[in-house]
From Swiss-Prot:
Mg(2+) binds at N206, D217. The record marks S36 as: ATP. GO terms for cellular component: cytoplasm. It is found in: Cytoplasm. Monomer. It comes from the Bacteria. A protein kinase that phosphorylates Ser and Thr residues. Probably acts to suppress the effects of stress linked to accumulation of reactive oxygen species. Probably involved in the extracytoplasmic stress response. Belongs to the SrkA/RdoA protein kinase family. The keyword Metal-binding applies. Keywords: ATP-binding, Cytoplasm, Kinase, Magnesium, Metal-binding, Nucleotide-binding, Phosphoprotein, Serine/threonine-protein kinase, Stress response, Transferase. Its EC number is 2.7.11.1. This is Stress response kinase A.
């Protein structure tokens, strides 16, 4: 099965409830879809008024071994008292299967949205990221990939080349801007960082707040540099980002060492995320959920803006990286 062409159109509510019933769970409420385009995620309540979340994985995106590694990492983190949403085990298994779909069941954990401009919350997140990475350093993922240029830049570049949905009037300029950006990232990228298991997609939307942070959604967990789990939390102008990063690092280093040389990877990682995200949208265009929710992707104005974004990011890559105050 080609995951680029796959849709979830055969995942009917009856299929979901049958899968849950196989694990001894009877759904007593409706299935409320949660915000996830890559997978299909639903919240529900059972007959005992317990709340759960069930996640059906997009076939062929991750292998069974890769998903199991994600689950094992989550369970290790819970054991090490890191607040993460970890899957529940049924007959000793966290990864379950039904009618060709793999799925997992999680307890439904409520919470407020993490406030990215709240320094006290940022400090707590930094401390727990230090603990998360302390667990992540124990051993690398064996089956899940490393963050690198091939997956995040060169493969997406080919996707852009082959994409029919990029308007013909914008494609040449966009590809030129892409190539210039790729060259700039390649010049800045370094691989001498210490590799560890990461959350991988640690932005404010994947952190809930319940008297402390709760990390959710390890679906993008990979091996890579520690800074990958820090930079997406930064916002505002450079002065604000500097203060936020210093707050995170100071709290982080109460638990784990942090190599400040990795700060130079922030803008290359940002560029890689920009490129990878666009390629992801194109790859998923065959899933009806994507044209419905991203209708602007075929518009000339959108691709003109992306070209401008790539040009601006290239300029940033040629500037000095974010600098901490001298005490660091």
């Amino acid at each position: 099965m080609n995951d680029n062409a796959f849709t979830f159109q055969t995942l009917h509510p009856e299929t979901i409830m049958d899968a849950l019933f196989e694990q001894g769970i009877r759904v007593d409420s409706g299935l409320t879809p949660l915000n996830s385009y890559e997978n299909r995620v639903y919240q529900f309540q059972d007959e005992d008024r317990r709340r759960f979340v069930v996640k059906f994985y997009r076939p062929e995106r991750w292998s069974v071994d890769q998903i199991r590694e994600e689950h094992q990492f989550a369970l290790e983190l819970v054991k090490d008292e890191v607040p993460v949403a970890a899957p529940l085990a049924f007959n000793g298994q966290t990864l379950l299967a039904h009618q060709g779909y793999h799925y997992a069941i999680f307890p439904s954990v409520g919470g407020r949205q993490f406030e990215a401009d709240n320094i006290d919350q940022m400090e707590a997140v930094g401390r727990y990221l230090g603990r998360l990475h302390q667990t992540g350093r124990k051993r690398p993922f064996t089956f899940r990939p490393d963050i690198g240029l091939a997956e995040y830049l060169f493969e997406p570049r080919q996707v852009f080349e082959d994409a029919a949905l990029i308007p013909s009037g914008q494609k040449a300029a966009f590809l030129k801007a892409t190539d210039t950006l790729l060259s700039a990232v390649t010049e800045c990228w370094r691989t001498d960082f210490a590799t560890l298991r990461l959350h991988g997609d640690c932005h404010a939307g994947n952190i809930l707040w319940r008297d402390g942070p709760l990390f959710v959604d390890l679906d993008d967990a990979r091996n890579g540099p520690a800074i990958q789990d820090l930079w997406m939390l930064l916002n505002g102008d450079k002065a604000e980002q500097r203060m936020q990063l210093e707050t995170i690092i100071e709290a982080y280093e109460e638990i784990s060492e942090f190599d400040t040389a990795e700060i130079g990877l922030i803008e290359p990682l940002r560029a890689m995320r920009l490129v990878y995200y666009l390629a992801w949208l194109i790859r998923r265009w065959g899933d009806p959920a994507f044209p419905k929710n991203f209708p602007w992707l075929t518009g000339e104005d959108y691709w003109q803006r992306q070209t401008t974004t790539f040009i601006e990011q290239t300029k940033i890559l040629h500037e000095p990286p974010l600098q901490l105050t001298p005490m660091y």
